[in-house]
């Protein structure tokens, strides 16, 4: 819940019109993808967005709000769950954040009566 909220809030903060959210399950991994059409992120800045208190564009701070902790929290949750979060963005515009984690299925034991 916290991961979804932080990723969507971040996308809404920087997007001009569109935010898309999808959830997929592939084998034993689930992936949450949040995409926006915001200003984009330069390749050399993609890892920095997960550091606490990092704001890539301080000139937008007053207009967009936030304190630079949302993506750092997502990163910490990903590590705690044995998952990962990554940023795929173009400096020309738009960003995709993918949060993936292992899913452990507990199947019922039908052999005992």
Listing of model-derived features with the role each one plays in the protein:
Residues 18-28:
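Short beta-strand/loop element within the Bergerat-fold HATPase_c
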Residues 70, 74:
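Short alpha-helical Gxxx[C/S/T] motif in the catalytic ATP-binding
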Residues 36:
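Acidic ATP/Mg2+-coordinating residue in the GHKL
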Residues 41-55:
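Short conserved segment of the HATPase_c
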């Amino acid at each position: 819940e916290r991961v979804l909220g932080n990723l969507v809030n971040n996308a809404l903060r920087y997007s001009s019109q569109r935010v898309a959210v999808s959830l997929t399950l592939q084998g034993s991994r689930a992936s949450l993808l949040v995409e926006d059409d915001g200003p984009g992120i330069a390749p050399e800045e993609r890892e920095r967005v997960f550091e606490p208190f990092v704001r890539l564009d301080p000139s937008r701070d007053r207009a967009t709000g936030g304190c630079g902790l949302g993506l750092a929290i997502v990163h910490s949750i990903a590590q705690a769950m044995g998952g990962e979060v990554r940023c795929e963005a173009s400096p020309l515009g738009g960003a995709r954040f993918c949060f993936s984690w292992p899913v452990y299925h507990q199947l019922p034991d039908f052999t005992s009566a």
